[in-house]
């Protein structure tokens, strides 16, 4: 489709068919559009709102170009959309570490920050984790520790064509929305935080179509009702649960699981070094109650979708034990040590 026609369609608020979106994304990934046209496309698509067909079409284009990683389909991804502008620390990353300490296999897909100060890749790097392991080394790390971090640019090299425009725009785009759908390990269990409640059904449709076994799509609210793309200890959390092809909706509150409400400001993060300190403090027991409970809440849901906990309450017990017993800290130390060894071997080979 000519770019002028495409822009006019989006300006008129018209939706693209799945096949049209696949062709559009092919052109984006091939660098066929100038930066100005690409920025306009992303902004107009965001303003119009992405449909399930458009998401599926874009997914098909991007995954056709992805480098895949052979892990366990029952591993859990805790990748969220980001873009909620709350400025919190990296809750889902802390939750992934805690859940891994509880025996949950983690295949976390993530990237550097595009719309916030610190993405999951940034904070892991600040914690001493080499994010750029090749797939073979990542598979070995997962085999030995049950933890993998899948750095998006390593597995989606075609995304490089849009990275600078996304960074310059600094707004939510279809790529924020697509991120959790693009795990190169093909995981079937996910905890997905979304920045808009309208995205919940869209995710449900796409995840079911891609063979999801058990996922929780969550949209939290702060104490003022502002959007939060994590399970919220500041207000209610809306959940769309997908389990073996069945959808169910829930609304839960932090008090339901023994957590104490706090203002969103109590979960404030900072730059990568500051967020790394927060995660270290959570692991060693010196973090504030609010930050610890925010991480535990997300870790509990991670344990639940993994199948190791039969409900979120049991997940809270598993996550709390992982943290309080020191299992999470010990596990992360082992992950970092093996990660460094594998990174060193890889660098020696390429040099």
From Swiss-Prot:
Taxonomy, superkingdom: Bacteria
Keyword line: Amino-acid biosynthesis, Aromatic amino acid biosynthesis, Glycosyltransferase, Magnesium, Metal-binding, Transferase, Tryptophan biosynthesis
Entry note: cofactor: Binds 2 magnesium ions per monomer.
EC number: 2.4.2.18
Pfam families found in the cross-reference section: Glycos_trans_3N (PF02885), Glycos_transf_3 (PF00591)
GO biological-process terms attached to the record: L-tryptophan biosynthetic process
Chain sites annotated for binding 5-phospho-alpha-D-ribose 1-diphosphate: 80, 83-84, 88, 90-93, 108-116, 120
Catalytic reaction annotation: N-(5-phospho-beta-D-ribosyl)anthranilate + diphosphate = 5-phospho-alpha-D-ribose 1-diphosphate + anthranilate
InterPro entries the UniProt entry points to: Anthranilate_Pribosyl_Tfrase (IPR005940), Glycosyl_Trfase_fam3 (IPR000312), Glycosyl_Trfase_fam3_N_dom (IPR017459), Glycosyl_Trfase_fam3_N_dom_sf (IPR036320), Nuc_phospho_transferase (IPR035902)
Binding-site list for Mg(2+) 2: 229-230
Cofactor: Mg(2+)
Sites where the protein binds anthranilate 2: 166
Gene Ontology CC: one annotated term: cytosol
Pathway info: Amino-acid biosynthesis; L-tryptophan biosynthesis; L-tryptophan from chorismate: step 2/5
Binding site for Mg(2+) 1: 92, 230
Subunit structure: Homodimer.
Function field: Catalyzes the transfer of the phosphoribosyl group of 5-phosphorylribose-1-pyrophosphate (PRPP) to anthranilate to yield N-(5'-phosphoribosyl)-anthranilate (PRA).
Family: Belongs to the anthranilate phosphoribosyltransferase family.
Protein name as catalogued: Anthranilate phosphoribosyltransferase
Source organism of the structure: Chlorobium phaeobacteroides (strain DSM 266 / SMG 266 / 2430)
Gene field: trpD
């Amino acid at each position: 489709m000519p770019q002028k026609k495409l822009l006019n369609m989006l300006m008129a608020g018209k939706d693209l068919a799945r096949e049209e979106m696949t062709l559009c994304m092919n052109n984006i990934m091939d660098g066929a559009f100038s930066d100005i046209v690409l920025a306009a496309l992303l902004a107009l698509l965001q303003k119009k709102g992405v449909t399930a067909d458009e998401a599926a079409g874009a997914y098909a284009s991007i995954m056709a170009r992805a480098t895949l990683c052979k892990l366990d389909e029952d591993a859990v991804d805790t990748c969220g959309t980001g873009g909620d502008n709350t400025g919190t620390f990296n809750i889902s990353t802390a939750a992934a570490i805690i859940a891994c300490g509880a025996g949950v296999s983690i295949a976390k897909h993530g990237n550097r920050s595009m719309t916030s100060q610190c993405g999951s890749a940034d904070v892991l790097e600040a914690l001493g984790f080499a994010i750029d392991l090749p797939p073979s080394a990542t598979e070995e790390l997962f085999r030995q520790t049950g933890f993998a971090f899948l750095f998006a640019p390593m597995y989606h090299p075609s995304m490089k064509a849009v990275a600078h425009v996304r960074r310059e725009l600094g707004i939510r785009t279809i790529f924020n929305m697509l991120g959790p759908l693009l795990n190169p390990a093909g995981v079937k269990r996910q905890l997905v935080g979304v920045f808009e409640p309208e995205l919940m059904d869209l995710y449900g449709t796409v995840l079911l179509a891609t063979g999801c076994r058990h996922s929780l799509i969550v949209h939290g609210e702060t104490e003022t009702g502002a959007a939060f793309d994590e399970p919220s200890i500041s207000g209610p959390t809306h959940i769309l649960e997908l389990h073996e092809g069945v959808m169910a909706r829930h609304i839960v509150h932090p008090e339901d699981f023994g957590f104490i409400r706090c203002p969103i400001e109590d979960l404030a993060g900072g730059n990568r070094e500051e967020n790394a300190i927060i995660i270290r403090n959570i692991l060693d027991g010196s973090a504030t109650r609010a930050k610890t409970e925010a991480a535990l809440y997300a870790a509990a849901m991670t344990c639940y979708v993994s199948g190791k906990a039969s409900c979120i309450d049991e997940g809270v017990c598993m996550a709390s034990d992982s943290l309080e017993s020191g299992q999470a800290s010990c596990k992360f130390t082992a992950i970092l040590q093996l990660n460094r060894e594998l990174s060193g071997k890889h660098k020696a080979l390429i040099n």
